[in-house]
């Protein structure tokens, strides 16, 4: 499936030294997927070494549109905060 990156996502990749391989691995083989009900996007999560990558994207006409992404070392804390307040709902 084709993948497009927003300017914002490309800037985050460059500034945060996110590896392209990590991005594609997260899209193809996520550990978890959440629906961000506040923004109408999907959020893929994948552990990569000691960090986790969080990737927000939309599916439009068969194209994956990556909106933003970042690494975190505090995944459990983030997921708890987002799911408890109902911002994210687990779909996978």
List the predicted regions and their residue ranges.
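Ribonuclease/tRNase effector modules and their secretory precursors
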Residues: 1-92
């Amino acid at each position: 499936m084709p993948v497009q990156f927003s300017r914002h996502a490309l800037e985050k990749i460059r500034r945060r030294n996110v590896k392209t391989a990590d991005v594609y691995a997260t899209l193809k083989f996520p550990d978890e997927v959440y629906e961000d009900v506040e923004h109408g996007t999907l959020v893929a999560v994948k552990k990569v070494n000691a960090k986790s990558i969080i990737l927000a994207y939309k599916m439009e006409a068969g194209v994956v549109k990556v909106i933003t992404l970042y690494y975190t070392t505090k995944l459990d804390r983030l997921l708890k905060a987002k799911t408890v307040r109902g911002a994210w709902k687990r779909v996978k």
